Amino acid sequence: MSDNIRTLQGRVLSNKMDKSITVAIERKVKHPLYGKFLKRTTKIHAHDEQNQCNAGDVVTIRECRPLSKTKSWTLVEVVSKA
């Protein structure tokens, strides 16, 4: 069961909360009529236990059990610093 854990990579937008970060996940979707690829952004709250992230960092997050009303993702690693 633990081999199906979803992981995503995104950019940190905010680290103003204690032990929490806001991560922007970008994906490309194709317009149904015109075929142009458009960028769509999803904002996800993730748990950052050591408060090690800063705004602009590229991070990897993974899905976990719900930690609060809006947090169900946790930080795995900081890929690159801002």
UniProtKB/Swiss-Prot annotation:
GO biological process per UniProt: translation
Alphabetical keyword list: Ribonucleoprotein, Ribosomal protein, RNA-binding, rRNA-binding
Keyword Transport: no
GO molecular function, one term: rRNA binding
Gene3D superfamilies listed in its UniProt record: Nucleic acid-binding proteins
Pfam families tied to this protein: Ribosomal_S17
The keyword Ribosomal protein is assigned to this record: yes
InterPro entries reported in the protein's UniProt record: NA-bd_OB-fold, Ribosomal_uS17, Ribosomal_uS17_bact/chlr, Ribosomal_uS17_CS
Stated role: One of the primary rRNA binding proteins, it binds specifically to the 5'-end of 16S ribosomal RNA.
HAMAP family registered for this protein in UniProt: Ribosomal_uS17_B (MF_01345_B)
Family: Belongs to the universal ribosomal protein uS17 family.
PANTHER family: 40S RIBOSOMAL PROTEIN S11 FAMILY MEMBER, SMALL RIBOSOMAL SUBUNIT PROTEIN US17M
Protein name: Small ribosomal subunit protein uS17
Organism: Shewanella piezotolerans (strain WP3 / JCM 13877)
Gene (UniProt): rpsQ
